[in-house]
């Protein structure tokens, strides 16, 4: 998956390289998150439910934040660039996670995998939008950088944990969880559109 993207990055020119850089960063932190999740699950002797609802949201959201913090500290980007970088990182994280899930579990239940992919992708994009949009605001105010970043990370972790909790619970809650991020994204898009007009 990475080699075609690398070739595309070389062919697209300098303006598009940031996109590919954050795409690779998202995939890389997804891979590292899997190892770190496994380590903490073994360290705390967590069962699948605890690992999914307590460990994974914290590890994954912190890992998605690290490339953004590096970008903010080294390059001091504009607000719109911060938002784009956060969403691209989250989107590539979700894409790689869904590919790993598909490889691990097979395509026997295509409809389940399809809805899981959409729900998980939307959830990661919402978490990325929370962090990216918030960082674009709080990093313009020196006094708010640390507390604001921690608060945004906490909000993203909470949303992610609620999503994972509903998924792990199963039954009707699982299907609500798959629909919830999609509905939130649609509502957010409508609100954003109406505020512009």
Residue ranges and their predicted role:
Residues 1-197:
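Hydrophobic alpha-helical segments at protein termini of multi-pass membrane proteins
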């Amino acid at each position: 998956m990475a080699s075609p993207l690398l070739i595309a990055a070389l062919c697209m020119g300098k303006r598009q390289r940031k996109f590919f850089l954050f795409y690779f960063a998202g995939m890389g932190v997804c891979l590292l998150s899997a190892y770190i999740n496994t380590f903490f699950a073994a360290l705390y002797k967590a069962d699948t439910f605890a690992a999914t609802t307590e460990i994974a949201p914290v590890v994954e959201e912190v890992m998605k934040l690290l490339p953004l913090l590096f970008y903010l500290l080294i390059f001091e980007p504009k607000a719109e660039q911060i938002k784009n970088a956060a969403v691209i990182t989250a989107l590539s994280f979700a894409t790689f996670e869904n590919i790993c899930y598909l490889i691990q579990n097979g395509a026997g239940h295509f409809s389940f995998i399809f809805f899981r992919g959409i729900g998980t992708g939307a959830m990661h994009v919402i978490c990325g939008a929370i962090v990216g949009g918030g960082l674009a605001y709080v990093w313009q105010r020196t006094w708010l950088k640390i507390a604001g970043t921690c608060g945004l990370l906490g909000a993203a972790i909470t949303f992610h944990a609620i999503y994972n909790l509903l998924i792990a619970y199963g039954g009707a809650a699982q299907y609500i969880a798959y629909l919830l991020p999609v509905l939130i994204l649609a509502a957010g898009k409508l609100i954003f559109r109406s505020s512009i007009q």
